């Protein structure tokens, strides 16, 4: 999958998905690689997720953009339960928050909790790219 990116002043997030087709019937069948830079704090990590849960996330994100209401969350079902959550307010601001972690060099656990805000106009291309990728898993 190509990179799906949101880049604004002070915030960057990138998703890349690798689906293990032979494991689609299992609850963890996809690696979601996430890169985040939020006001000069950054993380790059992988989440083990279910592609079907990711489709639900993309649908919720599309609805959030259309209605400026609700939330969209993708969360690891096991382990550190890393997550990315987007929510909207009626004025068109999209709040993004998350908790990411990774075992760094030497096995030291690294964690990043972040919050940021972007304008809704950053979402259409991001949602379009994610929806295009997810179409075969509907």
Predicted segments with their positions:
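Short, internal acidic amphipathic alpha-helical interface segments
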Residues: 58-92
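Short beta-strand segments
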Residues: 43-47, 82, 110-114
């Amino acid at each position: 999958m190509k990179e799906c990116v949101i880049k604004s002043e002070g915030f960057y997030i990138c998703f890349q998905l690798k689906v293990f087709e032979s494991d689609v019937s299992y609850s963890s069948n996809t690696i979601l690689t996430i890169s985040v830079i939020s006001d000069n704090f950054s993380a790059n990590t992988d989440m083990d997720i279910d592609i079907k849960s990711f489709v639900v996330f993309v649908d919720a994100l599309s609805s959030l953009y259309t209605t400026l209401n609700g939330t969209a969350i993708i969360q690891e079902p096991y382990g550190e339960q890393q997550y990315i959550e987007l929510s909207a307010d009626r004025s068109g601001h999209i709040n993004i928050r998350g908790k990411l972690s990774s075992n760094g060099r030497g096995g030291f656990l690294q964690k990043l909790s972040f919050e940021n805000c972007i304008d809704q106009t950053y979402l259409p291309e991001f949602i379009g790219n994610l929806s295009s990728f997810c179409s075969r898993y509907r």
